[in-house]
Design a protein with these regions (language model features):
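Membrane-interface helix-boundary motifs at transmembrane edges
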Residues: 1, 24, 53-67, 124-135
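Hydrophobic alpha-helical transmembrane segments of multi-pass membrane proteins
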Residues: 1-53, 70-88, 139-154
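Juxtamembrane loop-transmembrane helix junctions in multi-pass integral membrane proteins
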Residues: 18-35, 59-66, 97-104, 130, ...
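Alpha-helical transmembrane segments of polytopic membrane proteins
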Residues: 31-42, 101-114, 163-170
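Alpha-helical transmembrane segments in multipass membrane proteins, preferentially the mid-helix core
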Residues: 47-51, 110-131
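Extracellular-loop-to-transmembrane junctions of the mid-late helices
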Residues: 77-122, 153-155, 159
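Interfacial "cap-and-anchor" motif at the non-cytosolic start of specific transmembrane alpha-helices
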Residues: 123-189
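PAS/LOV and related PAS-like sensory modules
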Residues: 191-210
Length: 210
């Protein structure tokens, strides 16, 4: 998830870096970067659903792979529409000055993400009683924040609100995982220390008096 999110941020930065440049490198860089921003964004949705399914399964609960397959299908469909938009410019247009402009159907590109996040939200709601509070908050933030950002992105132009939200949410999940692992290691160390104490105590009690 973090790797895919990093790829999205890198492509978004490249799109801003090369916009307006009239040389050959700028011409191709802006077009490739904007295409990758859309495509990697959809791939990120599918990768996260895969992660969520595996995350729930790792807790010992049976969960079908069907939601992940549906998400990959939706992501593939969305990418196909991005390819089509390169010819009919329904999502965006890059003008003669090598500047990106939204088009009338840009909102459609965002609805795919909103719908995919709702699927993830339904999974989280269904298995909410089987996850800890910290896990629910971390995963829930990754679902809720991008949904809010997608709505805002439709109306806010010039600021990558969506990618900032996904980055912050991914960091929340990463921090949650690190905290959980630290707590697990601390509990294991405490249990190991407790298992050694009775043995040492028995040796002390059975030692003959001098």
């Amino acid at each position: 998830v973090l790797i895919t999110n990093t790829a999205v941020l890198f492509c978004d930065a490249a799109a801003w870096l090369f916009k307006g440049r009239m040389d050959l490198l700028g011409f191709y860089a802006v077009r490739i970067a904007n295409f990758c921003v859309f495509s990697f964004g959809y791939i990120l949705l599918a990768v996260f659903t895969d992660y969520l399914v595996c995350f729930i399964a790792s807790r010992g609960f049976g969960i079908l792979k069907f939601p992940a397959r549906v998400m990959w299908g939706l992501s593939f469909t969305a990418i196909v529409l991005v390819i089509i938009s390169q010819f009919n410019h329904m999502y965006y247009l890059i003008d003669d000055n090598n500047i990106y402009h939204r088009q009338n159907l840009f909102w459609l590109s965002q609805t795919f993400g909103i719908f995919c996040m709702l699927i993830d939200g339904s999974l989280l709601f269904r298995y909410r009683r089987r996850l800890s509070r910290a896990e629910l908050m971390a995963v829930g933030a990754y679902i809720a924040m991008p949904i809010i950002a997608m709505f805002l992105q439709i109306y806010i132009y010039g600021i990558a609100v969506l990618y900032l939200a996904t980055t912050i949410s991914a960091l929340c999940i990463y921090i949650s995982i690190q905290v959980e692992q630290s707590h697990k290691f601390a509990c294991e160390a405490l249990a190991l220390t407790g298992s050694r104490r009775p043995s040492g105590l028995r040796k002390t009690m059975t030692r003959p008096n001098s």
